[in-house]
Amino acid sequence: ILKYHKWHIPASIGLGTSPHDMLDDYTRVFGNNIRQRFPVVDTEIGKLGTMTCHDGATPEVSRALGYNGVEVICHPTAMQEVEGTSPPWDFWTFTRRTRAHDNMCYILGSNWGTVKHEYYPKGFCPGHSLIVDYTGMLLRQAPYPEEQVITATIDIESLREHRTIINHNMWIDIRTEGFREIYENPIYPPNRFPSGHPPKNQAEKVETTKTVLNTLYQRGQFVPPHGMNPDEMPGVLDQRIQRAQSQGTLLKDDE
Protein backbone atom coordinates (compact mmCIF):
# COMPACT_ATOMS: atom_id res chain seq x y z
CA ILE A 1 0.00 0.00 0.00
CA LEU A 2 3.05 2.26 0.06
CA LYS A 3 6.65 2.21 -1.14
CA TYR A 4 9.42 3.58 1.04
CA HIS A 5 13.19 3.52 0.53
CA LYS A 6 15.42 3.53 3.60
CA TRP A 7 16.98 6.98 4.02
CA HIS A 8 19.73 6.50 6.64
CA ILE A 9 22.26 3.74 5.96
CA PRO A 10 25.40 3.66 8.14
CA ALA A 11 28.58 4.01 6.10
CA SER A 12 30.23 1.35 8.25
CA ILE A 13 27.69 -1.41 7.55
CA GLY A 14 27.31 -3.20 4.23
CA LEU A 15 27.31 -1.86 0.67
CA GLY A 16 23.72 -0.64 0.66
CA THR A 17 22.98 2.84 -0.63
CA SER A 18 20.34 5.42 0.25
CA PRO A 19 18.15 7.63 -1.96
CA HIS A 20 20.40 10.41 -0.64
CA ASP A 21 23.44 8.72 -2.25
CA MET A 22 21.77 9.18 -5.66
CA LEU A 23 19.59 12.13 -4.77
CA ASP A 24 19.36 13.80 -8.18
CA ASP A 25 18.48 10.54 -9.96
CA TYR A 26 16.07 9.56 -7.21
CA THR A 27 14.11 12.82 -7.26
CA ARG A 28 13.73 12.66 -11.03
CA VAL A 29 11.95 9.32 -10.65
CA PHE A 30 10.16 9.58 -7.32
CA GLY A 31 9.61 13.32 -6.85
CA ASN A 32 11.15 16.07 -4.78
CA ASN A 33 8.80 16.72 -1.89
CA ILE A 34 8.58 15.36 1.62
CA ARG A 35 5.30 13.52 1.03
CA GLN A 36 6.84 11.49 -1.78
CA ARG A 37 10.06 10.71 0.10
CA PHE A 38 8.35 9.74 3.36
CA PRO A 39 4.89 8.53 2.32
CA VAL A 40 1.96 8.09 4.68
CA VAL A 41 -1.07 6.13 3.49
CA ASP A 42 -4.57 6.81 4.80
CA THR A 43 -6.38 3.52 5.51
CA GLU A 44 -9.51 2.45 7.34
CA ILE A 45 -7.37 1.48 10.33
CA GLY A 46 -5.40 4.73 10.49
CA LYS A 47 -2.66 6.67 8.71
CA LEU A 48 0.32 4.36 8.30
CA GLY A 49 3.98 4.96 7.51
CA THR A 50 7.24 3.09 7.82
CA MET A 51 10.89 3.64 8.64
CA THR A 52 13.63 1.04 8.46
CA CYS A 53 16.28 0.16 11.04
CA HIS A 54 18.83 3.03 11.30
CA ASP A 55 16.13 5.51 10.22
CA GLY A 56 14.93 5.41 13.81
CA ALA A 57 18.30 6.29 15.34
CA THR A 58 17.92 10.00 14.54
CA PRO A 59 14.78 12.18 14.69
CA GLU A 60 14.46 13.27 11.06
CA VAL A 61 12.59 10.38 9.38
CA SER A 62 9.99 9.99 12.12
CA ARG A 63 9.57 13.77 12.14
CA ALA A 64 8.95 13.78 8.39
CA LEU A 65 6.37 11.03 8.81
CA GLY A 66 4.79 12.98 11.66
CA TYR A 67 4.66 16.06 9.44
CA ASN A 68 2.82 13.96 6.88
CA GLY A 69 0.24 12.94 9.49
CA VAL A 70 1.35 9.43 10.44
CA GLU A 71 -0.55 7.71 13.25
CA VAL A 72 1.22 4.33 13.24
CA ILE A 73 4.86 3.81 12.20
CA CYS A 74 5.79 0.25 11.24
CA HIS A 75 9.48 -0.05 12.03
CA PRO A 76 11.38 -3.25 11.05
CA THR A 77 14.97 -3.39 12.28
CA ALA A 78 18.04 -5.58 12.65
CA MET A 79 19.65 -3.83 15.60
CA GLN A 80 22.65 -5.62 17.03
CA GLU A 81 23.54 -6.04 20.66
CA VAL A 82 26.71 -3.98 20.15
CA GLU A 83 24.47 -1.04 19.18
CA GLY A 84 22.90 -0.93 22.63
CA THR A 85 19.72 -2.92 22.14
CA SER A 86 19.59 -4.28 25.70
CA PRO A 87 19.91 -2.62 29.14
CA PRO A 88 21.72 -0.85 30.63
CA TRP A 89 22.36 1.18 27.45
CA ASP A 90 18.93 0.38 26.03
CA PHE A 91 19.41 2.71 23.06
CA TRP A 92 16.80 0.83 21.03
CA THR A 93 14.00 1.35 23.54
CA PHE A 94 14.53 4.92 24.70
CA THR A 95 15.04 6.32 21.20
CA ARG A 96 11.91 4.66 19.82
CA ARG A 97 9.86 5.79 22.79
CA THR A 98 11.13 9.31 22.11
CA ARG A 99 10.20 9.13 18.41
CA ALA A 100 6.65 8.05 19.32
CA HIS A 101 6.30 10.70 22.03
CA ASP A 102 7.63 13.57 19.91
CA ASN A 103 5.35 12.78 16.97
CA MET A 104 2.32 11.64 18.99
CA CYS A 105 2.05 8.34 17.11
CA TYR A 106 2.31 4.61 17.72
CA ILE A 107 5.52 2.78 16.83
CA LEU A 108 5.54 -0.95 16.13
CA GLY A 109 9.21 -1.92 16.27
CA SER A 110 10.13 -5.41 15.10
CA ASN A 111 13.76 -6.40 15.72
CA TRP A 112 15.54 -9.61 14.76
CA GLY A 113 15.25 -12.10 17.58
CA THR A 114 18.32 -14.07 16.57
CA VAL A 115 20.59 -14.61 13.58
CA LYS A 116 21.06 -18.21 12.52
CA HIS A 117 24.37 -17.98 10.70
CA GLU A 118 27.60 -19.63 11.79
CA TYR A 119 29.57 -16.38 11.57
CA TYR A 120 27.24 -14.56 14.00
CA PRO A 121 26.84 -15.35 17.71
CA LYS A 122 23.36 -16.50 18.69
CA GLY A 123 22.43 -13.26 20.48
CA PHE A 124 23.88 -10.98 17.78
CA CYS A 125 20.45 -9.35 17.38
CA PRO A 126 18.74 -9.76 20.75
CA GLY A 127 15.12 -9.04 19.90
CA HIS A 128 13.28 -6.70 22.27
CA SER A 129 10.62 -5.95 19.65
CA LEU A 130 8.21 -3.39 21.06
CA ILE A 131 4.93 -1.51 20.80
CA VAL A 132 4.96 2.12 21.94
CA ASP A 133 1.91 4.36 22.17
CA TYR A 134 1.47 8.00 21.16
CA THR A 135 2.60 9.29 24.58
CA GLY A 136 5.84 7.30 24.45
CA MET A 137 4.55 4.65 26.85
CA LEU A 138 5.98 1.18 26.32
CA LEU A 139 2.92 -1.05 25.93
CA ARG A 140 4.62 -4.38 25.18
CA GLN A 141 8.15 -5.65 24.64
CA ALA A 142 9.48 -9.05 23.67
CA PRO A 143 11.67 -10.20 26.58
CA TYR A 144 14.24 -12.45 24.88
CA PRO A 145 15.97 -13.16 21.54
CA GLU A 146 13.71 -15.75 19.92
CA GLU A 147 10.75 -15.69 17.55
CA GLN A 148 7.62 -14.56 19.39
CA VAL A 149 4.42 -12.54 19.04
CA ILE A 150 3.46 -9.51 21.13
CA THR A 151 0.11 -7.72 21.03
CA ALA A 152 -1.42 -4.47 22.22
CA THR A 153 -4.48 -2.38 21.43
CA ILE A 154 -3.85 0.34 18.84
CA ASP A 155 -6.52 2.90 19.68
CA ILE A 156 -6.59 5.40 16.81
CA GLU A 157 -9.58 7.30 18.18
CA SER A 158 -7.78 7.78 21.49
CA LEU A 159 -4.74 9.10 19.61
CA ARG A 160 -6.88 11.54 17.66
CA GLU A 161 -8.54 12.75 20.85
CA HIS A 162 -5.13 13.18 22.48
CA ARG A 163 -4.02 15.42 19.62
CA THR A 164 -6.86 17.85 20.36
CA ILE A 165 -5.35 18.69 23.76
CA ILE A 166 -3.22 21.84 23.85
CA ASN A 167 -1.13 20.95 26.91
CA HIS A 168 1.88 18.76 26.07
CA ASN A 169 0.97 18.72 22.38
CA MET A 170 4.28 18.04 20.65
CA TRP A 171 3.33 19.71 17.37
CA ILE A 172 1.64 22.91 18.51
CA ASP A 173 4.75 24.62 19.90
CA ILE A 174 7.25 23.91 17.12
CA ARG A 175 8.92 27.18 16.02
CA THR A 176 10.53 26.09 12.75
CA GLU A 177 12.13 29.40 11.76
CA GLY A 178 14.67 29.19 14.56
CA PHE A 179 16.06 25.87 13.34
CA ARG A 180 16.13 26.31 9.56
CA GLU A 181 19.89 26.90 9.48
CA ILE A 182 20.57 23.39 10.80
CA TYR A 183 19.11 21.79 7.69
CA GLU A 184 20.27 24.41 5.20
CA ASN A 185 23.90 23.48 5.94
CA PRO A 186 24.61 19.99 4.53
CA ILE A 187 26.41 17.40 6.65
CA TYR A 188 26.55 14.08 4.76
CA PRO A 189 27.20 14.81 1.03
CA PRO A 190 24.50 13.74 -1.46
CA ASN A 191 25.00 11.97 -4.80
CA ARG A 192 28.00 10.02 -3.56
CA PHE A 193 26.95 6.90 -5.49
CA PRO A 194 24.71 7.92 -8.42
CA SER A 195 22.63 5.39 -10.33
CA GLY A 196 24.83 2.77 -12.00
CA HIS A 197 27.86 3.54 -9.83
CA PRO A 198 27.46 1.62 -6.54
CA PRO A 199 30.27 1.46 -3.98
CA LYS A 200 32.97 -1.07 -4.87
CA ASN A 201 33.68 -1.99 -1.26
CA GLN A 202 33.24 -0.92 2.34
CA ALA A 203 36.30 1.33 2.34
CA GLU A 204 34.79 3.46 -0.43
CA LYS A 205 31.71 4.09 1.70
CA VAL A 206 33.71 4.81 4.84
CA GLU A 207 35.83 7.31 2.88
CA THR A 208 32.83 9.65 2.74
CA THR A 209 32.80 9.96 6.52
CA LYS A 210 36.15 11.78 6.37
CA THR A 211 34.41 14.64 4.59
CA VAL A 212 31.66 14.63 7.21
CA LEU A 213 34.09 14.60 10.14
CA ASN A 214 36.08 17.40 8.59
CA THR A 215 32.91 19.50 8.30
CA LEU A 216 31.95 18.91 11.93
CA TYR A 217 35.41 19.76 13.28
CA GLN A 218 36.08 22.71 10.99
CA ARG A 219 32.91 24.51 11.96
CA GLY A 220 33.55 23.91 15.65
CA GLN A 221 30.65 21.55 16.31
CA PHE A 222 33.08 18.82 17.41
CA VAL A 223 36.19 19.49 19.52
CA PRO A 224 39.26 17.27 18.88
CA PRO A 225 40.75 15.18 21.70
CA HIS A 226 43.49 16.77 23.78
CA GLY A 227 46.64 17.58 21.83
CA MET A 228 45.03 17.39 18.39
CA ASN A 229 43.70 20.03 16.00
CA PRO A 230 40.76 19.87 13.57
CA ASP A 231 42.98 19.42 10.50
CA GLU A 232 44.31 16.14 11.89
CA MET A 233 40.94 14.45 12.35
CA PRO A 234 40.42 13.04 8.81
CA GLY A 235 43.85 11.44 9.19
CA VAL A 236 42.64 9.64 12.32
CA LEU A 237 39.98 7.91 10.25
CA ASP A 238 42.59 7.05 7.59
CA GLN A 239 44.64 5.29 10.26
CA ARG A 240 41.62 3.31 11.40
CA ILE A 241 40.78 2.30 7.83
CA GLN A 242 44.37 1.15 7.24
CA ARG A 243 44.39 -0.82 10.48
CA ALA A 244 41.11 -2.54 9.59
CA GLN A 245 42.46 -3.38 6.13
CA SER A 246 45.66 -4.82 7.58
CA GLN A 247 43.57 -6.99 9.91
CA GLY A 248 41.39 -8.17 7.04
CA THR A 249 38.16 -6.74 8.48
CA LEU A 250 37.88 -4.14 5.70
CA LEU A 251 38.63 -4.93 2.05
CA LYS A 252 41.10 -2.83 0.10
CA ASP A 253 40.15 -1.22 -3.21
CA ASP A 254 41.89 -3.93 -5.22
CA GLU A 255 40.35 -6.87 -3.36
Model region roles, listed by residue range:
Residues 34, 93-96, 160, 172:
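Short alpha-helical segments used as structural interaction elements across diverse proteins
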Residues 84-110:
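Short, compositionally biased leader-like segments
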Residues 2-3, 102-106, 111-255:
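C-terminal beta-strand edge segments of enzyme domains
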Residues 1-76, 80-94:
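Active-site catalytic loop in hydrolytic enzyme cores
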Residues 37-39, 94-96, 135-141:
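Intrinsically disordered, low-complexity boundary segments flanking structured domains
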Residues 33, 40-44, 100, 122-123, ...:
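Solvent-exposed alpha-helices and their adjacent loops that cap or buttress functional pockets
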